[in-house]
Amino acid sequence: VLPYFKKSENQQRGASAYHGVDGELSVTDLISPAFVSQRFVDACVELGYDRNPDFNGVRQLGAGLYQSTIKDGKRHSTAAAFLLPIRQRSNLTITTGALVTRLLFKKTRVVGVEYLHSGMLHQVRVNQEVILSAGAYDSPQLLMLSGIGNAKYLQKLGISVVTDLPGVGQNLQDHVNVSVVRQTTQEINPAITSNGSEAGLFFNSEGNPKAAPDGQFFFGPGIYVPSGFNGPNQGFTGVVSLTRFQNIGSVSLRSSDPKDTPIIRMNYLQSEADVQKLVAGIRLMRKLFQSKAFNDFASKEIVPGPGVETDAALEAYI
C-alpha cells in the first residue's frame, strides 16, 4: 500500500522513498512544539532509545516528534483534502444524513447499496465497484445485514446468507491507553496550534530491535485528566498505549434491523499479559519523567499518584 500512501501525501519535508509530495493531504512538522516535548525525546535517548525523526519512514522504533496533517494553520482532514476540492464534479453526489441498510448483490457480486434518507429507502447501482468504508463497527454490521458472515448466526436472525464467512465482526481491535500526569511549577502553555500529543516513543517490550513495536508512548504539554478533575493546570501528560495485544473484541448484530446499534464487545484487559505490559509501561514512563532531562521541572505526579507503587495498586489504577 506504500505507493498509495505516497500518492496521497504532500509531505512538507520533500519526496523520499517513503513519502510523496504530489498528493492532496498536507503532512507537516509541528508549527511550534513545546520545549518540554523535546525534553521527552531527550529523556528517551538518555534511557537508551534511538532518536527517530520519521515514524513513517524505514523504521518505527525510537523517539521523536510527531508530524501533523496541517495546512495553512488548520487541521487538514481527509474530507478537506480529498472531498471538498471536487464536490462540484458532475459525476459526484454527496449525500449526508443517510443510513446504508444493506449491500445489493448480483449472485455474489456487490452491485450497489440500499440506504435510508429522510424516511425513504433508495437504491444506487454501479457498473464498476462499491467501496465499503463504514468504520470498525458499521462495516461488519453492514456486511452481516447483507448476508456476509457466520451463516448459522445470520439464519437465526432471519437474514438470507450470501457468503458464509464466520470471521466477520470477530477481529475488533482497539488500543488500551493509560496516563501518567505530572504537575510542574513552570508554565507549559501549549501553542493553540498544538495537536495535544507532540512527541512519542515506539518500543518493543522484549527489547528486540528487529521486532515490530508492541508499545507506544504519547507525550504532550498540558494536563489530560477526566472531566471534573479539580487540581493544578500546569503540567504534562504521558500516555502508555498497547499496539499489539492478546485480547480481541467482536461486533455482532442486535437484530436484522439496520437502525439497531450493533453489540460491541471490546474485551479490554481480559489478558493478564496485556495488563502487565501496561504496568511495565507506567513504570517506564515514570523512569523517563525522573530522568535528567526533566530535572529542572520540580514536578510531582498527579496521576496515578505517588502512593500508587505496587503492581496491585497499578493494576487497580489501570
Label for each model-derived stretch:
Residues 2-110, 116, 179-183, 190-192, ...:
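Conserved redox-cofactor binding core of oxidoreductases
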Residues 44, 157-160, 280-294:
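Internal hydrophobic alpha-helix adjacent to the cofactor/substrate pocket in enzyme cavities
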Residues 103-192, 255-256:
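Glycine-rich loop(s) and the adjacent beta-strand/alpha-helix scaffold that form part
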